[in-house]
Structure formats: C-alpha cells, structure tokens
C-alpha cells in the first residue's frame, strides 16, 4: 500500500521503517527539514535499536522517502497516518495544535483528490477528539464528507522505546477504531500478516483503549512500588512478595476483577484494604493509591444511588442483596449499603434475594439479618415477578442468572439499572448500565 506518515518522531519513524520493511511504499512527512534530510539519507532521526538499518534499507530499495510537502504526500498515497505529538498542557490537558494544523493542511490536499483516501490517527488523543476535532477540520478544509468521500480510523500504538520494532512486529493485538467499515478494512489489511488479533471497534472506544492501557500500566507500577514500600517497612523484601503475586494467572494477572460494575465487597477485600492502608499510615508510609481504594469504592455505590435517584420514581426493586450471586454473605455488601441509602432517603424499596431470604429463616446469618438489619429484612420478598411488577425502577444488583432477562427485555413502563453487566451492549433504551 502507498502510505504517508505525518510526524517522524518515535512513533512515526518506527512506523515508517517497519512499514517500508514489509514492502509498503512510504512517504514520511515532517516540518523539520533536518529530519527529512536524515530520512532521505537512510539515517534514523531518533535512537532506537535496529531502526537505522530498516530506514536505510527502505531508502535503498526506493520504498521510503521523506518530504515536508503535505499535499505531495497526500496525493501520492492511499492512506495517511497521523503520528504527530500531543504534549501535555500545564493543566494536564492535551495540546492539539499539531493535530489541528496537520488536519487543516491534509484537508486542503484532499479537496482536489479524486481517489478515496483514508486518514488514520495514530497519535494518542482523548475520547471524542477525532469526532469533535479531527473530522470537522478535515471536512471543513476538504469540502468532503468523512465516511463517504474519505475514510477515518484510529490506530493506537503500543510501542515502547528501545523495543519499538519488536513491539511493532509482535503486538499483543492491533486495535482499530473505524468510522466506517471500508476505513477499517483498508487499515486492517496493513496488519494482516502480523500474528496478533485485529480488534475493530468504534473510534471513541479505540481512543479510550489507548488511555486505559497506559493508565493500567502506570497503576501497576505505582501499586508495586507502594506494596514494596509497605513491605520494606514490615521487614519484608517487596520483590519477593511481588514475584509470588505475579505467579497467579487465575486471579492476580487475569481478566478476573477487570470488568466495570458495582463496588467490591465481601469478608476479605474491604477489611484487608482498610487494614493495610491503616498500617501504612501508622508507619508514615505514603501509599496514596492503596489509600484511595475505599474512597473510590464508596463513590461507585454513590453513583449507583444517583442513577436511581435521577429517575424521580420512589418505587424501586433491588434484585440481589448479597455482594455476589450464589451466597448469603452480606459482609461489606455494596448492595446492602445501597439499600440502606435508599431506605434512608425514603424510597419505597422491595428486595429480592432468595439466598439471603433463606439465610434469614434457616441459615447461620439469620440472627444478623433479623436483628441487626430488621428494616432491610422486612423488605425481602419471595416472589420475583411481584417485586418487578410493583416497581418503576428495577436495579440488577448481582449476577443471579434469573435477573439477566430483565436487562435484555425490559418490562413495559419500567426502567432497569444494570450494576452487573447483563446488558448485551450500551443502548439508549429503558436499560442503563452503571459504566455503559
């Protein structure tokens, strides 16, 4: 494919070398004449192992050249990758001046181009940037319609400095955010020979995926450091602790606990997070990430309450009171906390949880349910259909499979709030998810 790459910094230069190395005809574009001269001499403008050889081979074979002329590059290629920088402002927001200027020039070049062109944003931009900034500028300066006259896609990069070429050739996945199917197909064809899954999503989803991955990486580093600091204060080698923690691929390093939803609860997590946070404070150890977990957890319960409250109806059904399906354990249950909030605010609440109801009458937790939370116990009902019928707002509190149908087929005249993830997809209908 004929590809132009705008911005020849770390991302752009690596992409230029790797794409030309795989047989594509590449035109590198940069405002720096010095960088363009280096590219045309087959030299790398950055320090990256193996890149110089790739660029030299690309120039030697005629598959790679550089230019400062945006129009020339757009007219000579089928697809353009925007790899320009998006530095931080003093307030933490993104500086989009480079993106905006390139889009203006690219839009002007597209005005006179008859062949369909695809614009790919590889720069890291916040969700909404392509729809609210990139596309409007391209359409204004080209006089054309995105998704009709030209294609638009997002292709976040996951390259690490010093291992960028290996990361390009052996990615964990290739993420494509597509405005239209044709744009996604054209971009996907570039990566077809890589041994990695190609994930095609909407543009905003792809933008968010990039930030989520980077923030997750930063979170892991910070978490390990805080654990290490607390461990050292306890006379323990934090490296030894984390080595064993990382051996667990079933829970610790897995998809488990990695789905948005309601807050965590149960007998272990809240208690242990609180205990470790307290001990860190006692030892004068700064652990702001770990110390923030309980506050963040409480905020998620508050968000669930706010979602219920905004509907205006006072008749609410809470389906699931225990912190997870298949148990009667109410210790630190966020569902129980939510119920307490609703009761305290005067909602007419009815609750269905057959496990908790059974435990109240027959189980070991009966004393607690009847004597410690009698105001909640009195609201438990045994007829699911009746509970649903008498409510205006139905809250799916835990993953009891009996509740799933309500998210997919909302009863007429009802609102469903899904705290679990039963909804098959985000919709604008009568069902709403806490994070979707």
From Swiss-Prot:
NAD(+) binds at residues 10-11, 30, 35, 86, 124, 271, 331. GO terms for molecular function: GDP-mannose 6-dehydrogenase activity; NAD binding. SUPFAM superfamilies: 6-phosphogluconate dehydrogenase C-terminal domain-like, NAD(P)-binding Rossmann-fold domains, UDP-glucose/GDP-mannose dehydrogenase C-terminal domain. It comes from the Bacteria. Pathway: Glycan biosynthesis; alginate biosynthesis. It is an enzyme of class 1 (oxidoreductase). The active site is at residue 268. GDP-alpha-D-mannuronate binds at residues 161, 210, 214, 217, 225, 256-257, 259, 265, 324. GO terms for biological process: alginic acid biosynthetic process. Keywords: Alginate biosynthesis, NAD, Oxidoreductase. Its EC number is 1.1.1.132. InterPro entries: 6-PGluconate_DH-like_C_sf (IPR008927), GDPman_DH (IPR028358), NAD(P)-bd_dom_sf (IPR036291), UDP-Glc/GDP-Man (IPR017476), UDP-Glc/GDP-Man_DH_C (IPR014027), UDP-Glc/GDP-Man_DH_C_sf (IPR036220), UDP-Glc/GDP-Man_DH_dimer (IPR014026), UDP-Glc/GDP-Man_DH_N (IPR001732). Disulfide bonds: none annotated. Catalyzes the oxidation of guanosine diphospho-D-mannose (GDP-D-mannose) to GDP-D-mannuronic acid, a precursor for alginate polymerization. The alginate layer causes a mucoid phenotype and is essential for cyst formation. Belongs to the UDP-glucose/GDP-mannose dehydrogenase family. This is GDP-mannose 6-dehydrogenase. The gene is algD.
């Amino acid at each position: 494919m004929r590809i132009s790459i705008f911005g020849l910094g770390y991302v752009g230069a690596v992409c230029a070398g790797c794409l030309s190395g795989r047989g594509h005809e590449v035109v590198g574009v940069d405002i720096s004449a010095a960088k363009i001269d280096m590219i045309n001499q087959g030299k790398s403008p950055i320090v990256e192992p193996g890149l110089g050889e790739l660029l030299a081979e690309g120039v030697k074979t005629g598959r790679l050249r550089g230019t400062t002329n945006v129009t020339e590059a757009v007219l000579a290629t089928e697809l353009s990758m925007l790899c320009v920088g998006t530095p931080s402002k003093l307030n933490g927001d993104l500086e989009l001046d480079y993106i905006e200027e390139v889009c203006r020039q690219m839009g002007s070049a597209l005005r006179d181009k008859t062949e369909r062109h695809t614009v790919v944003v590889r720069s890291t931009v916040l969700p909404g940037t392509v729809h609210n900034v990139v596309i409007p500028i391209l359409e204004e300066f080209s006089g054309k319609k995105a998704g009709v006259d030209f294609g638009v896609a997002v292709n976040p990069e996951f390259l690490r400095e010093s291992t960028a070429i290996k990361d390009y050739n052996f990615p964990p996945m290739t993420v494509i955010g597509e405005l239209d199917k044709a744009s996604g197909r054209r971009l996907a064809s570039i990566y077809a020979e890589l041994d990695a899954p190609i994930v095609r999503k909407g543009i905003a989803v792809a933008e968010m995926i990039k930030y989520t991955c980077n923030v997750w990486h930063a979170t892991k580093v910070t978490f390990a450091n805080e654990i290490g600091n607390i461990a050292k204060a306890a006379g323990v080698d934090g490296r030894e602790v984390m080595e064993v923690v990382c051996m667990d691929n079933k829970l610790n390093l897995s998809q488990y606990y990695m789905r948005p939803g309601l807050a965590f609860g149960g007998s272990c997590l809240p208690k242990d997070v609180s205990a470790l946070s307290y001990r860190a404070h006692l030892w004068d150890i700064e652990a702001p990430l770990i110390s923030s977990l309980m506050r963040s957890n409480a905020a998620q319960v508050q968000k669930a309450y706010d979602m219920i409250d905004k509907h205006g109806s006072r008749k609410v059904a809470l389906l699931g009171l225990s912190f997870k399906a298949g148990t009667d354990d109410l210790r630190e249950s966020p569902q129980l906390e939510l119920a307490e909030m609703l009761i305290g605010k005067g909602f007419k609440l009815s609750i269905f949880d057959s496990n908790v109801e059974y435990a109240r009458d027959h189980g070991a937790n009966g004393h607690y349910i009847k004597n410690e939370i009698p105001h909640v116990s009195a609201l438990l009902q045994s007829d699911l259909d009746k509970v649903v019928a008498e409510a205006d707002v139905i809250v799916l509190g835990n993953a009891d499979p009996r509740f799933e149908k309500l998210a997919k087929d909302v009863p007429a005249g009802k609102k469903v709030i899904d705290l679990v993830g039963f909804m098959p997809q985000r919709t604008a209908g009568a069902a709403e998810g806490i994070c979707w």
